[in-house]
Amino acid sequence: MFPAQEEADRTVFVGNLEARVREEILYELFLQAGPLTKVTICKDREGKPKSFGFVCFKHPESVSYAIALLNGIRLYGRPINVQYRFGSSRSSEPANQSFESCVKINSHNYRNEEMLVGRSSFPMQYFPINNTSLPQEYFLFQKMQWHVYNPVLQLPYYEMTAPLPNSASVSSSLNHVPDLEAGPSSYKWTHQQPSDSDLYQMTAPLPNSASVSSSLNHVPDLEAGPSSYKWTHQQPSDSDLYQMNKRKRQKQTSDSDSSTDNNRGNECSQKFRKSKKKKRY
């Protein structure tokens, strides 16, 4: 097979193109049928794009699949015409019967599709393009194409961006409970009521240093409720009183002994000074 004939068997004719259609849009669209090697939109002598072009695939099997998949879909409101290229070995075959031997797809459903792009069960692929050189219409087309071939993005927007609870709600033990009756996208927040022991731990104040030093005991009043309390003083026993009085007496005697020792020392020093004065005379 000659190279020209082989390339013609891998190429499809795309007609009835709207003036805003660019080669990048056709590349993204026909990439669903298989890997591409070249996309061309014919132009006149003045450089203006014509209403037809050619898409060359890497494999000839992708040609019949592209015709069955994309023939008749609408780009900018105009249905495109996808056929075999003139001169190929299969150009005489009807376009709606060429793909039945490979995949059973009714191309009539795609010709009547009123959407911007056709449906496909294959995952959408993209190729890197310089964003600065693309028109605004291409990004609109690519955005709509992404929503068609990605069912995850068809969920309600607020389902994926539901606000997370802040630190205050997390600390107060908030639980997320979905409302099944209202639908999958609705939800409600229910507050978990703290138990009596939690209320007691949060509301009961701690004793200060004075109350701790005076040997105070915290006794909760169960009859008044979990958040009420009273303070009771522990009375010392008889043995404790005896020890306290004994310590006081020992302290008093030690103070008196130290005072008498000081007086004796002063008297001795005075006598020593007087004896020195007498010796001088």
Curated annotation (Swiss-Prot):
Motif (Bipartite nuclear localization signal): 245-280
GO biological process: cell differentiation; cellular response to oxidative stress; mRNA processing; regulation of alternative mRNA splicing, via spliceosome; RNA splicing
Entry GO MF terms: poly(U) RNA binding; protein homodimerization activity; single-stranded RNA binding
Domain RRM residues, every copy: 10-87
Compositionally biased tracts (Polar residues): 187-217, 229-242
Region described as Disordered: 184-281
Key word ATP-binding present: no
Pfam families (UniProt xref): RRM_1 (PF00076)
Known tissue expression: Expressed in brain, hippocampus, prefrontal cortex, cerebellum, spinal cord, testis, mammary gland, spleen and kidney. Also expressed in fetal brain.
Subcellular compartments: Nucleus, Nucleoplasm; Nucleus speckle
SUPFAM superfamilies: RNA-binding domain, RBD
Main function: Tissue-specific splicing factor with potential implication in the regulation of alternative splicing during neuron and germ cell differentiation. Antagonizes SRSF1-mediated BCL-X splicing. May affect the choice of alternative 5' splice sites by binding to specific sequences in exons and antagonizing the SR protein SRSF1.
Name of the protein in its database record: Splicing regulator RBM11
Species of origin: Homo sapiens (Human)
